[in-house]
């Protein structure tokens, strides 16, 4: 599979980057312990909060100890986690990772996690009592998300049956089509015409606009407009609940 250049990625992710730059205060991307340390020294922050979606899952995180705020070890600051997630109810840390992260987490002022299973994992493996809290996406009301959609002047969605499928397969596709036919709905997705897992070098070089991911508010509007939603992921379920689908 072709890996686009930095310049090509800036085009492919332009809608996502627009949302981040407009609505989220952020640093430059950080790729190492040294960069985390530099950011901390430059920012002179009073508190650090880590979270949320699978931030404590080793297979998804190449600098796991930094997700336990190792770069603040010598600082007199507040350390908290909000809705941190292990992404699984099984313990995936190596013995060494467990020792390092337990020592770091025990220095936190407050530990909250996204799942009940996370409470158990923290207690059993890291020696910390954690609190189960809401996913941060559920801290906002439906009206807050609709306000974003309106600010961006997002046009109406192209269908009535929104399918947000992260792991597509023929069985899921068949099910979506059957539901659409039975309910008289028009299925639609919010994805690039040329999806990442299938795109080639030729696709990126000759039709890069087809590789561009739709905007965040396009995705939010899909939940708002749809008469019915079919999803296979946690956040798909969450936004279905938020928009009463």
Could you describe each region identified by the protein language model?
Residues 244-245:
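Structural loop-to-beta junction motif characteristic of Rossmann-like glycosyltransferase folds
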Residues 81-88, 119-122, 165, 172-215:
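Catalytic donor nucleotide-activated moiety binding site of glycosyltransferases and closely related
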Residues 130-138, 142, 200-232:
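Donor nucleotide-activated moiety binding/catalytic core segment of transferases
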Residues 45, 108, 226:
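An anion/phosphate-binding loop that grips the pyrophosphate of nucleotide cofactors and donors
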Residues 41-44, 72-76, 145-160:
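Nucleotide-sugar donor-binding and catalytic loop/hinge architecture
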């Amino acid at each position: 599979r072709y890996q686009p250049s930095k310049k090509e990625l800036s085009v492919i992710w332009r809608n996502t980057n627009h949302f981040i730059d407009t609505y989220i205060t952020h640093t430059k991307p950080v790729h190492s312990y040294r960069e985390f340390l530099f950011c901390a020294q430059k920012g002179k922050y009073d508190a650090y909060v880590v979270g949320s979606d699978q931030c404590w899952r080793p297979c998804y995180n190449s600098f796991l100890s930094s997700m336990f705020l190792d770069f603040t070890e010598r600082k007199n600051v507040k350390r908290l986690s909000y809705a941190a997630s292990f992404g699984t109810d099984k313990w995936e840390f190596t013995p060494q990772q467990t020792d390092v992260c337990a020592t770091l987490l025990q220095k936190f002022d407050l530990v909250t996690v996204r799942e009940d299973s996370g409470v158990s994992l923290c207690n059993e493996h890291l020696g910390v009592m954690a609190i189960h809290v809401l996913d941060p996406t559920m801290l906002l009301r439906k009206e807050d998300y609709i306000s974003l959609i309106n600010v961006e002047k997002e046009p109406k969605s192209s269908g009535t049956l929104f399918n947000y499928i992260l792991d597509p397969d023929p069985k899921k596709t068949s099910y979506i089509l059957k539901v659409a036919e039975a309910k008289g709905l028009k299925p639609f997705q919010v994805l690039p015409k040329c999806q990442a897992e299938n795109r080639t070098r030729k696709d990126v070089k000759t039709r890069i606009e087809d590789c561009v991911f739709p905007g965040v508010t396009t995705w939010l509007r899909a939940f708002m407009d749809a008469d019915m939603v079919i999803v296979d992921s946690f956040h798909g379920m969450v936004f279905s609940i938020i928009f009463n689908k």
